[in-house]
From Swiss-Prot:
Main location: cytoplasm
Name recorded for this polypeptide: Threonine--tRNA ligase
Reaction(s) catalysed by this chain's protein: tRNA(Thr) + L-threonine + ATP = L-threonyl-tRNA(Thr) + AMP + diphosphate + H(+)
Gene behind the chain: thrS
InterPro entries in UniProt: aa-tRNA-synt_IIb, aa-tRNA-synth_II, aa-tRNA-synth_II/BPL/LPL, Anticodon-bd, Anticodon-bd_dom_sf, Beta-grasp_dom_sf, TGS, TGS-like
Transmembrane segments: none
Family per similarity comment: Belongs to the class-II aminoacyl-tRNA synthetase family.
Length: 648
């Protein structure tokens, strides 16, 4: 008998060779009907894989991220079969699951594929799926695998890099593919499919290699799910931050300035400034000190930190100074500069923690094909801070940072999130720097802090930064999409590299621990996500313009100006639309600009010293007439509901 531990901690005994599906049926027949994938001791397996040892078993349904991953990966196999049948002679390469679907990179050689072909590919995929063919894994020798793919240079290259005894094929119907595993039970579960697009993609992501065709698709267990997903995509297009940023006059790009380098227009700059001031106020209460570092640094600085070895290829080329023979880099990270700020003077344990904060702009050489609006740029500003503390202070400092992140999210309407504990890949420790002892200390500090704060957590191995583990906040937006926003990282490595010290109570020198944190991540990316999450209807306290005064005619311009002065006295951000347009046209334009309050002034309002309020997005609900003081109270109350006071 073997002992199987389930996620709820319960342990059940089964005969050796029991399959995950049999375990699922032992739990509940109804539950088993929905199980489509499993993992055993952290390794993804099929539901019919025999279990021969004690271990931890997780069973996945379509509602689980791992279940969707297996579903989409399996569909990529079926799509590959359909493509081979429809386009004989093509060469298949790789076909992984990705967020919201899958892709397969294919060498079509002289054949062409276009949007006009999508329907026939979808039809063939569904035709194969209806056959209810089982996905079956089987081990093969390296020689057998190479023989199978002797005419496919791409698969041959992949196989050549694998060790004998680790190679497996996946079969379904008459189709075979090189694969590590992780499939649904059979093709019959696939009920709806959509080919989304095709694009060029270099083999292995290297532009020196041949350009292949990447075929993107998605699939679902019900047609209804696909229909809802496509409707969601249409809504996402309407909320696209690039579209809204242009319409709301927040930011722009210029080919003369350069790709991936956003220009912030007055309204966007005001929005950024308001976010910065919001965080600075909270940070001041939490004991942070503002610092400023230059946009460039000597190459040797980033060699010392390890960033040059890790990110050198993603940095802009060094800047050379002819006279001194020095090499400078555009700053890729702020942390080395903050280490040098710490090193300016000696510290005692009584001085710690030191908390340095900076809205520091950094630069990365992103490939032009990877640039995307504000979410992937070449120059971006991080709300960076670094805390230098004693090992004894680490747990408490980490918890305080969590409190700050939760305050930021709560004030901006991000209520649905998961805290991802990102740890080392236990099988590939060479890609990380630092000692095992320090890594274990750092990982335990994060796990304990997240537990103490009652966060909803998931653990992801292999997602740690190269210098330390981290806590990533995975936020769901209004469309249900998941984004990685705030991050907190523990680092024992940089204090070693920069020889940071403090004098302890024992009068000896010790190394501080370093915490990296950025609740926004970057201003650019955060604003892009916030823009799409709110569809441009930002919280009232954040809006560049909270109200617009619409005069019914030129006769009431002076009263409109008087109203504006009174609003400014109440610190309400407003402007006047005094164009020679109809009130209907002015209202439509204000609606397009998503200004929260339209204040209409005419004869009655001037006579009574009032304003008529129309709320954005509430057409047909009627206006209310109030005094300026009453309106100021309405604004103040609404802001208080969303913008809480940060307490430490």
């Amino acid at each position: 008998m073997i002992k199987i531990t389930l996620p709820d901690g319960s342990i059940r005994e089964f005969a050796q060779g029991v399959t995950p599906m049999e375990v699922a049926k032992n739990i509940s027949e109804g539950f088993a009907r929905n199980v489509i994938s499993a993992s055993f001791n952290g390794t993804t397996i099929e539901t019919e894989t025999p279990l021969t040892t004690d271990g931890n078993l997780i069973l996945y349904t379509w509602n689980d991220a791992e279940g969707k991953k297996a579903f989409w990966h399996s569909t990529s196999h079926v799509m590959a079969q359909a493509l081979e049948e429809l386009y004989p002679g093509i060469k298949l390469t790789l076909g992984p699951a990705i967020a919201n679907g899958f892709y397969y990179d294919v060498d079509f050689e002289d054949q062409k594929i276009s949007e006009a072909d999508f329907k026939k590919i979808e039809d063939r995929i569904l035709e194969i799926a209806r056959g209810k063919f089982d996905f079956k894994m089987r081990p093969v020798t390296k020689a057998e695998a190479l023989e199978m793919y002797k005419d496919n240079v791409y698969k041959t290259e992949l196989i050549s890099n694998l060790e004998d005894g680790t190679i497996t094929f996946c079969d379904h119907a008459t189709f075979t593919d090189l694969c590590r595993g992780g499939h649904i039970p059979n093709t019959g579960i696939i009920k709806a499919v959509k080919i989304m697009s095709v694009a060029g993609a270099y083999w292995r992501g290297d532009e020196k290699n041949k350009q292949l065709t990447r075929v993107y698709g998605t699939s679902f267990p019900k047609q209804k799910d696909l229909t809802e997903y496509l409707e969601l995509l249409e809504e996402a297009k309407r909320r696209d931050h690039r579209k809204l940023g242009k319409e709301l006059e927040l930011f722009a790009f210029s080919q003369k300035v350069g790709q991936g380098l956003p220009l912030w227009l007055p309204k966007g700059a005001a929005l950024r400034d308001r976010l910065e001031q919001f965080l600075k106020r909270a940070q001041k209460k939490a004991g942070y000190e503002q610092v400023v570092s230059p946009h460039i640094g000597q190459k040797e600085l980033y060699v010392t930190s390890g960033h040059y070895a890790k990110y050198g290829a993603d940095s802009f080329q060094p800047i050379h100074t002819p006279a001194e023979g020095e090499e400078f880099l555009l700053k890729p990270m702020n942390c080395p500069h903050h280490c040098e700020i710490y090193n300016v003077r000696p510290w005692s344990y009584k001085d710690l923690p030191k908390r340095y904060a900076e809205f520091g702009t950094v630069y990365r050489y992103e490939q032009s094909g990877e640039l995307h609006g504000l979410t992937r740029v070449r120059g971006f500003t991080q709300d960076d801070a670094h805390i230098f503390c004693t090992p004894e202070q680490l747990d408490e400092e980490f918890k305080k940072v969590i409190d700050l992140v939760l305050y930021v999210f709560g004030s901006l309407g991000f209520e649905n999130f998961t805290a991802q504990i990102s740890l080392r890949d236990q099988e590939d420790r060479e890609k990380y720097i630092g000692t095992d002892e320090n890594w274990e200390k750092a990982e335990n500090a994060i796990i304990n802090a997240a537990k103490d704060k009652g966060l909803n957590t998931v653990v992801e191995y292999g997602e740690a930064a190269f210098y330390g583990p981290k806590l990533d906040f995975m936020v769901k937006d209004a469309l249900g999409r998941q984004w990685q926003l705030g991050t907190i990282q523990v680092d024992y490595n940089l204090p070693e590299r920069f020889e940071l010290t403090y004098k302890g109570a024992d009068n000896e020198l010790h190394r501080p621990v370093m915490i990296h944190r950025a609740p926004f991540g970057s201003m650019e990316r955060f604003i892009a996500i916030l823009l799409e999450h709110t569809a441009g209807n930002f919280p009232l306290w954040l809006m560049p313009e909270q109200a617009i005064i619409l005069s019914l005619s030129e006769k009431y311009e002076n009263y409109a100006k008087k109203v504006l002065d009174l609003l400014e006295n109440h610190e309400i951000r407003a402007l006047i639309d005094n164009r020679n347009e109809t009130i209907g046209k002015k209202i439509r334009d204000a609606e397009m600009q998503k200004i929260p309050f339209m204040l209409i002034v005419g004869e009655e309002e001037e006579k009574n010293g009032t304003i008529s309020i129309r709320r954005h997005g509430q057409e047909g609900k009627g206006n209310i007439t109030v005094s300026i003081e009453e309106f100021a109270s309405i604004v103040d109350e609404e802001i208080k509901k969303t913008l809480k006071v940060f307490t430490v």
